[in-house]
Amino acid sequence: MKPLIVLFVVFALSIGIMWLAFSSINYMLAGRIALAAMLVLTAFGHFKFVEGMEMMIPDFLPFKRFFVYSTGILELLAAVGLLFDSTFEITGLLLIIFFVLILPSNIQASMRHINIEKGTLDGPGLSYLWFRVPLQILFIGWTYFVTLR
């Protein structure tokens, strides 16, 4: 829920600041700024909630902590890439692929009742997918519209 709030609030703030400062609004840029802010937030989670994030990674994959930190770093790099005219398109394409690839980890987290912030097995369970899957589709669509369309 926090990433969604950050996405919408930063989008609205970006629009307001553009309108006040420039008397015009670049909605695509505002959308990329909002997506970048959201990615900074989610990247922070990779460093703050390491144990819970490790629990999301399938058991057959070794070096779970490496994956957690690496994806956090990738999210930070993507946040930067979204802000430059020369890189936002490739960043958007790679982000869409990333969002598709991480969905199984979110599904596994729900199936195992993983509470990411606590690193425990008392999370909301499968009912969370009714929110998470549409949210992931929103992130993919948002990324497409502000970077590739």
Task: Mark where each language-model region is.
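Membrane-interface extramembranous regions
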Residues: 1-149
